[in-house]
From Swiss-Prot:
Subunit structure: Interacts with FYB1, which is required for SKAP2 protein stability. Interacts with PTPNS1. Part of a complex consisting of SKAP2, FYB1 and PTPNS1. Part of a complex consisting of SKAP2, FYB1 and LILRB3. Interacts with LAT, GRB2, PTK2B and PRAM1. May interact with actin. May interact with FYN, HCK and LYN. Interacts with FASLG.
Residue numbers of Phosphoserine PTMs: S5, S6, S87, S90, S223, S282, S285
Lineage summary: Eukaryota, Metazoa, Chordata, Craniata, Vertebrata
Protein name (Swiss-Prot/TrEMBL): Src kinase-associated phosphoprotein 2
Region (Disordered): 62-88, 232-254
Pfam families recorded: PH, SH3_1
Biological-process GO terms, alphabetical: B cell activation; negative regulation of cell population proliferation
Described function: May be involved in B-cell and macrophage adhesion processes. In B-cells, may act by coupling the B-cell receptor (BCR) to integrin activation. May play a role in src signaling pathway.
Superkingdom of origin organism: Eukaryota
Organism: Bos taurus (Bovine)
Principal localisation: cytoplasm
Family of this protein: Belongs to the SKAP family.
């Protein structure tokens, strides 16, 4: 029998053969690896794996040599199947996890040290692999920290395998990435002339939550966030030695004297006075804009996560709770004033999202 490595590939393998060999490779190299095999069976398995690699080398070598000769241009993978725009983009931009991503613009950080994590969990990340399938899915612990998407080998890793800023990207569900039972669990993060990132979540619901959270942050980045320009920054520092008007908070979390109005002759119950004063402040500040709540859908938000107020002026709510936003006066500090079930308090804007797509 001739040595497989000495045979040249006269033509690409038919698609049916590629699919069959891909299934055999997965079964032999991955599934059987976790089985308790006898010594003889292991030897047979290893021999079969070697034969598969020899066959792969025949059909990949010519294409790889051609790609090298053309100074790094993409080679045509005979096992990749018919090209599509998604696959071509993935092949162009999806490098090994260990390679620096996007110029390595973020310093190494442990998974447990990430600040302000908005969404985190295990996902399968798609990467290019020189196998019959053309791609492989790797389990990664992913986290959205502020506006940066990090991915790790596990949630205990001391350094990320890669990361990228989501600014300028688009996020959408994509059920064409897989043909198995997880096809409805896939989503991708893409942008023109940038690397495309493709992931599989544990369930369609989890994938939708990732897409929802990423889109929320992207929309928030382009929303009416008050810019802190030089003039505003100067006003803040110039007025340090002088008292500010009661309507302008001096720190990110307004103190009681700044947001609660004095209510005479109601000092017996301090908590009640604060709540009523806060309610009056909020209602007075937004009375001219709220209008009829039954039709003012843009002000209805819902909780993304459980939130327990650390101070008495902060609203506590659970994931899915409906909150009516009364004011965005403290938007620059990351806080809004909301009302839920008659209670009024400060709401961290990163913990809520719009209920209605208007």
């Amino acid at each position: 029998m001739p040595n497989p490595s000495s045979i040249s590939a006269p033509y690409p393998l038919p698609e049916e053969i590629r699919n069959l060999l891909a299934d055999v490779e997965t079964f032999v190299a991955d599934i059987l690896r976790g089985e308790n095999l006898s010594k003889k069976a292991k030897e047979k398995r290893d021999a079969l794996v070697k034969k598969i690699k020899d066959v792969k080398s025949i059909y990949l070598q010519e294409s790889q040599d051609k790609g090298d000769a053309e100074d790094g241009e993409e080679y045509d993978d005979p096992f990749a199947g018919p090209p599509d725009t998604i696959s071509l983009a993935s092949e162009r931009y999806d490098k090994d996890d260990e390679a620096p991503s996007d110029g390595n613009q973020f310093p190494p950080i442990a998974a447990q040290d990430l600040p302000f994590v908005l969404k985190a969990g295990y996902l399968e990340k798609r990467r290019k692999d020189h196998s019959f399938l053309g791609f492989e899915w790797q389990k990664r612990w992913c986290a959205l920290s502020k506006t940066v998407f990090y991915y790790y080998g596990s949630d205990k890793d001391k350094q990320q395998k890669g990361e990228f800023a989501i600014d300028g990207y688009n996020v959408r569900m994509n059920n064409t990435l897989r043909k198995d039972g997880k096809k409805d669990c896939c989503f991708e993060i893409s942008a023109p002339d940038k690397r495309i990132y493709q992931f599989t979540a544990a369930s369609p619901k989890d994938a939708e939550e990732w897409v929802q959270q990423l889109n929320f942050v992207l929309q928030d980045m382009g929303s009416d966030v008050i810019p802190e320009d030089d003039e505003e920054r100067g006003e803040l520092y110039d007025d340090v030695d002088h008292p500010l008007p009661s309507s302008s908070p001096t720190r990110s979390l307004p103190i009681d004297d700044e947001i609660y109005e004095e209510l005479p002759e109601e000092e017996e119950d301090g908590a009640l006075v604060k709540v009523e004063g806060q309610r009056k402040m909020s209602q007075d500040s937004v009375h001219h804009t709220t209008g009829d709540k039954s039709t003012n859908y843009a002000n209805f938000y819902q909780g993304l996560w459980d939130c327990t107020g650390a101070l008495s002026d902060e609203l506590s709510f659970k994931r899915g709770d409906v909150i009516y936003i009364l004011s965005k006066e403290y938007n620059r500090y990351g806080w809004w004033v909301g009302e839920m079930k008659g209670a009024i308090g400060l709401v961290p804007k990163a913990y809520v999202m719009e209920m209605y797509d208007i």
